UniProtKB/Swiss-Prot annotation:
Record keyword Hydrolase present: yes
Entry EC no(s): 3.6.4.-
Domain notes: Has 3 domains, the large (RuvB-L) and small ATPase (RuvB-S) domains and the C-terminal head (RuvB-H) domain. The head domain binds DNA, while the ATPase domains jointly bind ATP, ADP or are empty depending on the state of the subunit in the translocation cycle. During a single DNA translocation step the structure of each domain remains the same, but their relative positions change.
Organism: Shewanella sp. (strain ANA-3)
Taxonomic lineage of the native organism: Bacteria, Pseudomonadati, Pseudomonadota, Gammaproteobacteria, Alteromonadales
GO cellular component: cytoplasm; Holliday junction resolvase complex
Chain segments carrying region Head domain (RuvB-H): 258-334
Protein residues bound to DNA: R294, R313, R318
BP-aspect Gene Ontology terms: DNA recombination; DNA repair
Entry's family note: Belongs to the RuvB family.
Protein's name according to its UniProt entry: Holliday junction branch migration complex subunit RuvB
Binding positions (Mg(2+)): T69
Gene3D superfamilies: 1.10.8.60, P-loop containing nucleotide triphosphate hydrolases (3.40.50.300), Winged helix-like DNA-binding domain superfamily/Winged helix DNA-binding domain (1.10.10.10)
Subcellular localization, as worded in the UniProt entry: Cytoplasm
Amino acid sequence: MIEADRLIQPQLQGQDDVIDRAMRPKLLDEYTGQDDTRAQLKVFIQAAKNREEALDHMLIYGPPGLGKTTLAMIVANEMGVNIKSTSGPVLEKAGDLAALLTNLEAGDVLFIDEIHRLSPVVEEILYPAMEDYQLDIMIGEGPAARSIKLDLPPFTLVGATTRAGALTSPLRARFGIPLRLEFYNVKDLSTIVTRSAQVMGLAIDSEGATEIAKRSRGTPRIANRLLRRVRDYAEVKHDGAVTQKVAEQALDLLDVDGEGFDYMDRKLLLAIIDKFMGGPVGLDNLAAAIGEERETIEDVLEPFLIQQGFIQRTPRGRIATTRAYLHFGMIKPE
């Protein structure tokens, strides 16, 4: 099974982007969760508006699906300015970035998703633009080439990344506002599910929303995706309303268990428990045992299991924790 096949993957798939857009909150007061980040942003935005200045450059980082793009849109809405969106891989040449920068108006937000994937050439252009609101452009080629400086209006760069450590130090240092997004708790996710259901015109009770939230791996994008699949089940198998029982039946049918694990998560945990006596087991052996690439385990399967305390990463290899044994109704050997 590859990552794109998984219902509970946090990355965008299918029509996620179009549907997520319809459900996105527009203002900070509508945004649920990330309380510390929200409180900080309210202060920074109000201060910038009082001084009639562009907001400082902002780096939003954290696991995928937590609302980095949504937050960038909200910043633009709160500041009352336009937002232009792009992503690191799209900006292949310096001219691609220059075209975007020269079309910005004073105070506008430039949002670059996957900013850790910017090419070095494009990144070099970005430094003076961020620091001095200037664009250095080379005119001509060879010995006759010369550099000219263009003044840019004050703007706010909002960079988003799932891998803050992959940013170069010079780029990271130019962001005045670093914001880390954390996984959501069940209460906040339940609120998000309820709001999304209202947008969809779907009847859902609090227990139904909580059941979906519990299995959403702390991620709003997954919660909204599961909600859409539960709606399908409710309309076909029941009267269209989502209760706890309906949500449980639908998610069990989809093979998403009470912890938000799917077949691949359980396969990985059981391999450590059954084939390697709970570990420690090296990554290459584990990959061979479950028929997956080591990169898939490291980047896709492991992070959530480690974050939730089901796997422990040690110098000698991976170990299944007591919590992993309990999940399958087993007792961990002493």
